[in-house]
Each structure stands twice: as structure tokens, then as C-alpha cells.
């Protein structure tokens, strides 16, 4: 099965966007999960600035 050149370009673009989203979204996702799943919930200011 042959994939057209346009389809290849589109797939490359989608993978590049996915790579960028994963790269910049991984740490905020982990922080958000830790914040929302912890018990008791920490104050948001403490999460943003630990010295506050």
C-alpha cells in the first residue's frame, strides 16, 4: 500500500506537533496530577513557590 506524499507530510506534521506537546506538557501534567491527587491538598502558593 502506497502513501501519498501529502499524507506523509501530514503525518510528519502531526508527529512533530505531538512531540512538542509531550515535551512541554509532561512536567506540568505530573505536577497537576500530584496536586489534584494528594491528600491533604497543598496550598497552591506552596506548589508554585516552595519558599512562600
Swiss-Prot record:
Belongs to the Tom7 family. This is Mitochondrial import receptor subunit tom7. GO terms for molecular function: ATP hydrolysis activity; structural molecule activity. It is found in: Mitochondrion outer membrane. Forms part of the preprotein translocase complex of the outer mitochondrial membrane (TOM complex) which consists of at least 8 different proteins (tom5, tom6, tom7, tom20, tom22, tom37, tom40 and tom70). One of its GO terms (biological process) is protein import into mitochondrial matrix. Its main location: mitochondrion. Pfam families: Tom7. GO terms for cellular component: endoplasmic reticulum; mitochondrial outer membrane; mitochondrial outer membrane translocase complex. Residues 1-19 are cytoplasmic. InterPro entries: Tom7 (IPR012621). The chain crosses the membrane at residues 20-36. Residues 37-52 are mitochondrial intermembrane. It is a single-pass membrane protein. Keywords: Membrane, Mitochondrion, Mitochondrion outer membrane, Protein transport, Transmembrane, Transmembrane helix, Transport.
Amino acid at each position: 500500500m502506497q502513501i501519498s506524499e501529502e499524507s506523509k507530510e501530514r503525518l510528519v506534521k502531526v508527529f512533530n506537533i505531538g512531540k512538542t506537546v509531550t515535551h512541554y506538557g509532561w512536567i506540568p501534567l505530573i505536577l497537576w496530577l500530584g496536586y489534584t491527587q494528594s491528600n491533604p491538598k497543598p496550598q497552591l502558593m506552596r506548589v508554585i513557590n516552595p519558599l512562600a
